[in-house]
Amino acid sequence: MDPSEYFAGGNPSDQQNQKRQLQICGPRPSPLSVHKDSHKIKKPPKHPAPPPNRDQPPPYIPREPVVIYAVSPKVVHATASEFMNVVQRLTGISSGVFLESGGGGDVSPAARLASTENASPRGGKEPAARDETVEINTAMEEAAEFGGYAPGILSPSPALLPTASTGIFSPMYHQGGMFSPAIPLGLFSPAGFMSPFRSPGFTSLVASPTFADFFSHIWDQD
């Protein structure tokens, strides 16, 4: 098929215009030729499909649960009227079942443990705990009567605290009109009362009679 006809769509006028546009200027190039050696080259065969990977783990299949019995299960035949008695005998609701069954060989260890717990008194430890509570309450009441205070958990009675020793506080003394170094010099001087740098709270502290009585009591002891 002429390419001009393909592009022109079959119209004669369009074909002529297309031929004019597709005219090659200059000599036509020589056709391509294939060398003889190239004909000897053959396409290699396809590679065979790779074998399945043997290292690949098999698909995961979930395992079914395995039931482990302490006692091998066995079938026990019983009628409807004897069903409750058979179940009670095998589960062991009392210690007398083992005596009747000749040692309880057909009874599971869990049933033996349950029967042992039922036979032993569970409230054996409760009286001991109650006795300890009574002893603690009695001790607290005796301490309250001795010290004359309400018993507490953290703080002891004030009467039981040791008295403060006389040397725990350093005495305040004055020599030649000089106060102790622990007290500022201008505390009781007129300059200290009239100082513009004093705070209102400090003035009220100095003017308090309780504060003055406290220091006079210490000075009288000296």
From Swiss-Prot:
Its main location: nucleus. Residues 12-21 have a biased composition (Polar residues). GO terms for biological process: defense response; innate immune response-activating signaling pathway. It holds the Pfam family VQ. Residues 37-46 have a biased composition (Basic residues). Keywords: Nucleus, Phosphoprotein, Plant defense. GO terms for cellular component: nucleus. Residues 47-61 have a biased composition (Pro residues). The keyword Secreted does not apply. Phosphorylated on serine residue by MPK4. The keyword Transferase does not apply. Residues 1-61, 105-130 are annotated as: Disordered. InterPro entries: VQ, VQ_8/17/18/20/21/25. The modification Phosphoserine is found at S30, S72, S108, S120. It comes from the Eukaryota. It is found in: Nucleus. A motif (VQ) lies at residues 83-92. Regulator of plant defense response. May contribute to MPK4-regulated defense activation by coupling the kinase to specific WRKY transcription factors. Interacts with MPK4, WRKY25 and WRKY33. This is Protein MKS1.
